[in-house]
A protein has these predicted regions:
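Active-site glycine- and acidic-residue-rich loops that bind
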Residues: 58-66, 169-178
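Mid-to-C-terminal alpha-helical segments outside catalytic/metal-binding sites
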Residues: 210-248
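Short acidic active-site motifs
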Residues: 154-156, 177-180
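Short, acidic/turn-prone active-site loops that include or flank metal/cofactor-
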Residues: 13-16, 170-175, 199-200
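Short acidic/histidine-rich active-site segments
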Residues: 190-206
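Short helix-capping segments at alpha-helix termini
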Residues: 42-45, 136-142, 188-189, 218-224
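Mid-domain alpha/beta scaffold segments of enzyme catalytic cores
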Residues: 1-110, 116, 121, 128-133, ...
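Short active-site-adjacent structural elements
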Residues: 175, 202-206, 238-239
């Protein structure tokens, strides 16, 4: 990643890959991201920041998810924590809804940026439910501080109409291909859209961002537009956090 030109990583809280058995597994994971992953990234001259949350995929176990949310509070003031996220929906149910709203409340109380996860199925329902929750929480006036991730062709216009930042996850097999992401950019412009990648439990490619930059160059996009969607839009979003200190 360093050799490919990546300078900064913002890592959101993910799910464990298998069912969690105790609050301690959340604590270990959060500390691992804050401490070990930051140190590891910096050894390769990459700055590293963290978004903290109980991930939507792990938000339905009771009382575990609520206990984890209580435990999360002591980590939020750590210097590398720049946002609450990912939060939102996986299966779209009332248990996920409860954790989503509680974590939105935390973001407001702590004046933190928010990263929202759209479900991988029923995305239209997911964006509509997300809009409804944001409206009920009186957050439609704060959408410049909200990133909605995992957009597709059927959600991106609604995300941008809300005034939120729109994440496009380029990921082999299950999410967007580079060409799908580029087609969405051609249709919707480059403002408030950011390309991101993943390195998780499935087939993934942490070099998806420079890959998209290369493919955009082949298609004749300007240097400015390429840099906006692969770097500067994300930079503009995250620098709203006082703890995001990296500068070009």
């Amino acid at each position: 990643m360093s050799k490919a030109g990546i300078k900064v990583i913002v890592q959101p809280s993910f799910w464990l890959g298998s069912p969690r058995t105790s609050v301690g597994t959340f604590k270990d994971y959060w500390e691992h991201m804050i401490s070990f992953e930051t140190k590891r990234s910096m050894e390769f001259n990459i700055d590293h920041y963290v978004c903290l949350s109980v991930n939507p995929k792990e938000s339905t176990e009771r009382p575990l998810a609520l206990d984890a949310l209580e435990a999360m509070a002591k980590y939020l003031d750590r210097e590398r924590i720049v946002a609450i996220g990912e939060i939102g929906y996986n299966s779209i149910n009332h248990l996920e809804d409860e954790l989503f709203q509680l974590q939105l409340d935390i973001a407001v109380d702590k004046n933190m940026l928010t990263m929202i996860h759209l479900p991988h199925i029923n995305k239209k329902d997911g964006i509509e439910r997300t809009k409804s929750v944001l409206k009920s929480k009186n957050l439609l006036g704060l959408t410049n501080r909200i990133l909605i991730d995992h957009n597709t062709e059927e959600t991106i216009q609604k995300t941008l109409e809300l005034g939120c930042w729109a994440g496009l996850t380029v990921y082999p097999i299950t999410k967007l291909s580079p060409i799908r992401a580029i087609n969405m950019i051609e249709k919707n412009g480059v403002d408030k859209i950011m390309i991101n990648s993943s390195a998780d439990w499935g087939v993934s490619d942490p070099l998806s961002v420079p890959l998209v930059a290369r493919e955009m160059k082949k298609k004749g996009f300007s240097k400015n537009d390429i840099e906006k969607v692969t770097f500067y839009n994300a930079f503009e979003f995250f620098k709203q956090s006082a703890k995001f200190l990296w500068r070009p």
